[in-house]
Amino acid sequence: MPKVMKIGKYQKRRRKRAGLPILLILLLIVAFGSLAYSVVLGKQMVDSGLIAETSSEKDVDNVISDIELTPSEPASSSQQAPEFGVPLPESKRVMGTYFDDAVFFGDSVTDGISLYDVMSNAKVISHTGINPGTALTSKVIKTSDGEKITMIDALKEANPKKIYIMIGINSIAMDKDTFLSSYSKMLDTIMEQHPDAIIYIQPITPITAAFEQSSKNTYKITNERISEFNEGILALAGEKQVYFVNINEVLADETGALPDDASPKDGIHFGAKYYEKWFEYLKTHTAPV
């Protein structure tokens, strides 16, 4: 009688072996499904802004390049370097105390500051008939002990923080180039002695039309010639990088002359009203801090 094979146990073993691949396949499907879900979820979170997208190396390079090529914002007007060689523009008005540490250095026109007591807190070093050359050499300033010293030495002793210069009306008859050379030397000396001071140059003030035509005008001074000298002074201000304060904006009329009523006596020197105009202009034309 043939041997009958018992298949019950065999079939059970086959079913066990067949179940392993199916289990692996199911696990792989679950794993890939989870991965796909993570990718989709991650993209949704990036799109919604919940997380930041990771940049590639190329993207980072592009960002750096963009930063390097983007121009910086311009500095504010208060931070910009001052422009020299042009008249100082209007600025915020300062108080009279601004001139506490200032010296006004000049000729007979500057003398009027003391004469009319316009700015009593400011120191004045001036002399009638002075010019840029004699300001360095002529001993015309009397000290407290009676000794006489030059204007430039008096300025050195005063050691001001601000210096306002006005010299030139007595030099109009000179050769212009000679005058400017002398003026340049005077400026160099002042700047060397006072390296930290704010230096303001003021133009030669105009004369009246009446005096321009007067027989008393022995040196044939004209406002046109004064203007030519002032252009040279302005150029020096640019070269030396000091400030030019164009006070003639408030002293001259529409023709460029000093109004006749401003100087009825001699056509050159003016009265207290015009000194007040002068100083009001200075208060609104100061160097940036």
Predicted features and spans:
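Catalytic His-Asp segment of secreted/periplasmic serine-dependent ester chemistry enzymes
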Residues: I207-V289
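Conserved SGNH/GDSL esterase-like catalytic core that processes O-acyl groups on lipids
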Residues: K92-S181
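A short helix->loop->beta-strand "cap" motif at the edges of active sites that frequently abuts
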Residues: H194-I198
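N-terminal, intrinsically disordered, polar/charged segments of Gram-positive cell-envelope systems
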Residues: S38-D101
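N-terminal Lys/Arg-rich, disordered targeting/topogenic segments
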Residues: M1-G19
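Hydrophobic membrane-insertion alpha-helices, especially the h-region
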Residues: I22-Y37
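Generic structural signal for well-ordered alpha-helices
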Residues: Y183-L187, N230
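Second-shell loop/turn segments in exported
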Residues: T137-I141, I169-T178, I190, K216-N223, ...
